[in-house]
Amino acid sequence: MIPVIALVGRPNVGKSTLFNRLTHTRDALVADFPGLTRDRKYGRAEVEGHEFIVVDTGGIDGTEDGVETKMAGQSLLAIEEADIVLFMVDARAGLMPADQGIAQHLRSREKATFLVANKTDGIDPDTATADFYSLGLGEVHAIAASHGRGVTQLIEDVMAPYMDAEEPEVELTEEEENAAYWAEQEAQGEDVPPEDPEDDFDPRTLPIKLAIVGRPNVGKSTLTNRILGEDRVVVYDMPGTTRDSIYIPMTRDDREYILIDTAGVRKRGKITETVEKFSVIKTLQAIEDSNVVLLVIDARDGISDQDLSLLGFILNSGRSLVIAVNKWDGMTEEARAQVKDMLDLRLGFVDFARIHFISALHGSGVGNLFESVQEAYDCSTKRVGTSLLTRIMQMAEEDHQPPLVRGRRVKLKYAHAGGYNPPIVVIHGNQVTDLSDSYKRYLMNYFRRSLKVMGTPIRIQFKEGENPFAGKRNPLTPNQMRKRKRLMSHLKKGK
């Protein structure tokens, strides 16, 4: 399970700066949920291969006596939901009473806490951080978030307990070598043997992890119970490691699924709450742990900023996507037409996703969701050989040549699969990293159409070979050597 790191501390100690540094954003608004999360901000981060969710809890002010009151509510909830707490202090301002109050609260929580002294640039970090050892939170990690100094080492120290639990990345160096060989053979007109990468792997033998996410009161629990109440075989309820999320194995149409319910499955007679229980942390973790995300949108409320924030997080995580527009029943034809126009206008950036119009309460359209879920999963895990990807790349190049870069035509050599879920196509060539964004989008869309990929984003990565002449001087020809000798002798005579 992807860990959650919460940033806590007084105002103006640099939490937002560190948040922006970790999430590679500028505005610290990766996923902001007004009215529900107050001043908490959420983002997905990756540092040196370590993936995690980072939460900026906002400034916590107050004294040692009143810190419990100041930390109540949303900020306290963020700390409780986090796996790791980074307690940030200002090295330039020194130890403050509010720091002592926050530290006392954190010590009582028995949470993995790291004391981080920010703004140590331009000063002696040992002298500036000496007073903070009195907080009783162990070693003080000195960083300069604005310049990124010490941030990578901090994350490596924080994530050390999770390194053994992380799944090893799949190395494709052997496939890259094979891809280069067969691309060369094909260029010479030789027959390329049929490929079947990873013969032993059949994604259909694995259950599909389906996360149902959405804003409160859009009908997630109603939809979950409708799914479980129709032609289902529930084997058992297995509480997941995600806080309060429930993992429910089920079978539908001879296909196994694991339903990840972030709202909690309740019996039909107990769905009486007007607003469903909602936790941003649970939602983001469920997205990361899923294969396919089913995003539920309220047709009567339209597309909100919260929906767009969730969509952005889903895209960044690379998960497959199916969109369900709920509460479609009872709407007039005019209202439905307006909703469809709005979807076309605001959801153009996820045109690969199937959109279904359903009524979770009455069950209309619910059965068709699983066809799109299965399609999205199959597309995201489909194995494609190097020769096919290279041929598609060549056809795209023939239809629309790459642009000139510094007077030279970009050369695309070969393509191969670089990963799945989401599908990744790696293109090798010369100057490929200088391709314009528009041409990269053209290649992505061309691969999507050619491979008939639906329901999942597709990513294109570019790799350049090293220039064998980089840093080397061309040897002089014999004629150039004679000219050089004549020039040198002429210069000596002139002296």
UniProtKB/Swiss-Prot annotation:
<feature type="binding site">
    <location>
        <begin position="9"/>
        <end position="16"/>
    </location>
    <ligand>
        <name>GTP 1</name>
    </ligand>
</feature>
<dbReference type="InterPro" id="IPR016484">
    <property type="entry name" value="GTPase_Der"/>
</dbReference>
<dbReference type="InterPro" id="IPR027417">
    <property type="entry name" value="P-loop_NTPase"/>
</dbReference>
<feature type="binding site">
    <location>
        <begin position="118"/>
        <end position="121"/>
    </location>
    <ligand>
        <name>GTP 1</name>
    </ligand>
</feature>
<feature type="binding site">
    <location>
        <begin position="326"/>
        <end position="329"/>
    </location>
    <ligand>
        <name>GTP 2</name>
    </ligand>
</feature>
<dbReference type="InterPro" id="IPR015946">
    <property type="entry name" value="KH_dom-like_a/b"/>
</dbReference>
<protein>
    <recommendedName>
        <fullName>GTPase Der</fullName>
    </recommendedName>
</protein>
<feature type="domain" description="EngA-type G 1">
    <location>
        <begin position="3"/>
        <end position="166"/>
    </location>
</feature>
<keyword id="KW-0342">GTP-binding</keyword>
<dbReference type="InterPro" id="IPR006073">
    <property type="entry name" value="GTP-bd"/>
</dbReference>
<dbReference type="GO" id="GO:0043022">
    <property type="term" value="F:ribosome binding"/>
</dbReference>
<dbReference type="GO" id="GO:0005525">
    <property type="term" value="F:GTP binding"/>
</dbReference>
<dbReference type="InterPro" id="IPR032859">
    <property type="entry name" value="KH_dom-like"/>
</dbReference>
<keyword id="KW-0690">Ribosome biogenesis</keyword>
<keyword id="KW-0547">Nucleotide-binding</keyword>
<feature type="binding site">
    <location>
        <begin position="214"/>
        <end position="221"/>
    </location>
    <ligand>
        <name>GTP 2</name>
    </ligand>
</feature>
<dbReference type="InterPro" id="IPR005225">
    <property type="entry name" value="Small_GTP-bd"/>
</dbReference>
<dbReference type="Pfam" id="PF01926">
    <property type="entry name" value="MMR_HSR1"/>
</dbReference>
<comment type="similarity">
    <text>Belongs to the TRAFAC class TrmE-Era-EngA-EngB-Septin-like GTPase superfamily. EngA (Der) GTPase family.</text>
</comment>
<feature type="domain" description="EngA-type G 2">
    <location>
        <begin position="208"/>
        <end position="381"/>
    </location>
</feature>
<feature type="binding site">
    <location>
        <begin position="56"/>
        <end position="60"/>
    </location>
    <ligand>
        <name>GTP 1</name>
    </ligand>
</feature>
<dbReference type="GO" id="GO:0042254">
    <property type="term" value="P:ribosome biogenesis"/>
</dbReference>
<dbReference type="InterPro" id="IPR031166">
    <property type="entry name" value="G_ENGA"/>
</dbReference>
<feature type="binding site">
    <location>
        <begin position="261"/>
        <end position="265"/>
    </location>
    <ligand>
        <name>GTP 2</name>
    </ligand>
</feature>
<keyword id="KW-0677">Repeat</keyword>
<feature type="domain" description="KH-like">
    <location>
        <begin position="382"/>
        <end position="466"/>
    </location>
</feature>
<comment type="function">
    <text>GTPase that plays an essential role in the late steps of ribosome biogenesis.</text>
</comment>
<dbReference type="Pfam" id="PF14714">
    <property type="entry name" value="KH_dom-like"/>
</dbReference>
<comment type="subunit">
    <text>Associates with the 50S ribosomal subunit.</text>
</comment>
